[in-house]
Amino acid sequence: MWFLFLLLPLWAGCAEPGDSEWVHLPSKCEVCKYVALELKSSFDETSRTRELIDTRYGFLEDDKKKKKIKYTTSDIRLIEVTEGLCSRLLEYNLHKERTGSNRFAKGMSETFQTLHHLVHKGVKVVMDIPYELWNETSAEVADMKKQCDVMMENYEEVIEDWYRNHQDEDLSEFLCARHVLKGQDQSCLSEQGDSRKGDTGPSTGTKKQKKQGEKKNKSKKQNSGSKEEKKQMDQPMAAKEEL
């Protein structure tokens, strides 16, 4: 049995928020950057439907005259997107091997991928935190979610204005540069995303389905081949019976 002892500050949850050596809380720029990114993503996910919303309730004569409106321009879509927006930030992890705002990304960090692989190979990894807490939300990500809640409340009208009148403009520029970070540090907005990707979780099953499909095709070919051979063998037997 191999032993690996690590006393590295890999998990921010072990330290107090005031300990700068362990915890580097997200800046206002970083929070706004990922809030805008998740807003874009969520609006994009809900933009593909052609659903119509019926606004006629039939209680008043004026209500009967109202027409159906598109879901993509409705208040319902805006509410659904913004309501659970900050919870999406909890899908992020802290990647301490990266710099700048790229330290926040979805998927497992390279450091923890390596540690998990060592554990799966039978190496006993001893750290200052138990194995069960390796995948817990870090203090930085928890704080980003907290700041997001406040930001969404304070800039609700700005987001609504973009949704109704400025969807042709970049959301990061409109929300962060012009409003949230006006006159403040905006350097993180221009940082390019890290091309490295973490372990995003379990397989989607595509490869497995592909293999199963290949097996089915192979089985079909074998069955068709055996049927053909049987047919060829039956023909001489039938000829003998006729004789």
Curated annotation (Swiss-Prot):
One of its GO terms (cellular component) is endoplasmic reticulum. Disulfide bonds join C29-C188, C32-C176, C86-C148. One of its GO terms (biological process) is innate immune response. Residues 186-243 are annotated as: Disordered. Residues 136-160 form a coiled coil. This is Protein canopy homolog 3. Residues 1-15 form the signal peptide. Transmembrane segments: none annotated. It comes from the Eukaryota. Residues 226-243 have a biased composition (Basic and acidic residues). It comes from Xenopus laevis. The gene is cnpy3. It is found in: Endoplasmic reticulum. InterPro entries: DUF3456 (IPR021852). Belongs to the canopy family. Keywords: Chaperone, Coiled coil, Disulfide bond, Endoplasmic reticulum, Immunity, Innate immunity, Signal. Toll-like receptor (TLR)-specific co-chaperone for HSP90B1. Required for proper TLR folding and hence controls TLR exit from the endoplasmic reticulum. Consequently, required for immune responses. Residues 27-236 form the Saposin B-type domain. Pfam families: DUF3456.
